[in-house]
A protein has these predicted regions:
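Alpha-helical transmembrane segments within multi-pass membrane transporters and channels
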Residues: 60-103, 110, 245-250, 254, ...
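Short, non-helical or kinked segments that cap or interrupt transmembrane helices
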Residues: 27-49, 90-95, 167-170, 188, ...
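Transmembrane alpha-helical segments in multi-pass inner-membrane proteins
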Residues: 60-62, 66-71, 193-203, 207-208, ...
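Membrane-embedded helix boundary and interhelical linker motif in transport proteins
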Residues: 11, 33-79, 83, 260-268
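Membrane-interfacial amphipathic/re-entrant helices at transmembrane-helix boundaries
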Residues: 1-22, 51, 59-65, 91-97, ...
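Hydrophobic core segments of alpha-helical transmembrane domains in multi-pass membrane transport
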Residues: 49-54, 70-76, 103-111, 150-159, ...
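Helix-loop-helix "hairpin" substructures at the membrane interface of multi-pass membrane proteins
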Residues: 16-17, 137-221, 240-246
């Protein structure tokens, strides 16, 4: 493998890792505050892609379609939290897992009924369809660089929200001890709705940005969800910092393994080795730390 190819794959790995971070931090926030493992999180990724496609059909402009899809995704999440999740907060973890898994099945069938089973390709915005030379001899797509930049900005805004605002203080306090937050007279129901909407917006943002790179189709969020859960386990359940580190680890490890493993192993099992690479990484991390790299400590 040439140095140029290695550099390009590292860029791909970082971009993929940052997308996984947007997904994983949403799962982390929901679990940290609401104590719910949301198995419907991948569906929110899928919904973001479909809403972008529909918004493009209505407006014909990415400048209008992207914010429209983003806002619509947040509204879907608010309705979902109020109607479906809110009655489950006092139920056991099994009920919550079954309910959110049922939502995944529901959304997969719903988009099939509305838009059909066929994969729907989305065009990359013409303004971002070119490529730039990142180093002499290495050309990289502009759109992937934009995705990386947007994900970094989103992460910085999230960091500012959590560490520098009143809402962020409530999120951090609720993550440590939600009983005390409730005792202080804070509207926990509203806090839950805001947290779930924020997590859904991050997942939808990932789906919106990945839509032009992937064909939008029913179930597109399912494999993303599985990888996201691997990221959360590696980083530590409930840890935002762990979500970032775990996402970058998985993104780089998965991307580079798909290039390096076929160079080392030329057997029929090569594809299987590539597919299990991130699970091997997860097993190694758990071997040394049963709670992940940065497990959150709760009061």
């Amino acid at each position: 493998m040439t140095l140029i190819l290695l550099i390009e794959q590292i860029f791909n790995g970082v971009q993929y890792g940052l997308m996984l971070f947007l997904m994983a931090v949403g799962v982390t926030l929901v679990f940290g505050i609401m104590r719910v493992i949301n198995l419907a999180h991948g569906s929110l990724f899928m919904i973001g892609g479909y809403l972008l496609m529909q918004s493009l059909a209505w407006t014909g402009s990415y400048a209008l379609a992207v914010p429209l899809a983003f806002i619509a995704s947040a509204l879907v999440a608010i309705v979902l939290e109020v109607i479906v999740l809110r009655p489950l907060y006092r139920r056991g973890p099994l009920d919550q897992v079954l309910a959110t898994f049922g939502l995944t099945l529901f959304f997969n069938e719903a988009v099939t009924v509305i838009w059909g089973r066929e994969a729907i390709p989305l065009m990359i915005p013409p303004l971002l369809s070119g490529a730039v030379e990142i180093i002499p001899g290495a050309v990289y797509p502009v759109y992937r660089l934009v995705i990386t930049g947007v994900a970094i900005v989103a992460g910085m805004l999230l960091y500012f929200l959590i560490t520098r605002t009143r809402i962020g203080a409530l999120i951090r306090a609720g993550s440590d001890n939600r009983e005390i937050v409730a005792a202080l007279g804070i509207n926990i129901s509203l806090l839950y709705t805001l947290v779930f909407a924020l997590s859904a917006m991050l997942a939808a943002l990932a789906g919106i940005m990945m839509g032009p790179l992937l064909s939008v189709e029913p179930g597109i969020g399912d494999p993303i969800l599985i990888t996201t859960l691997v990221v959360v386990v590696i980083g530590g359940i409930g840890s935002v910092r762990g979500a970032l580190v775990g996402a970058l680890m998985v993104g780089l490890f998965d991307t580079l393994s798909r290039v390096l493993i076929p160079l080392v192993f030329t057997t029929n099992a090569t594809s299987a080795l590539v597919n299990i690479a991130i699970y091997v990484l997860m097993a190694v991390v758990l071997l040394f730390s049963r709670t992940g790299l940065f497990a959150a400590h709760r009061g």
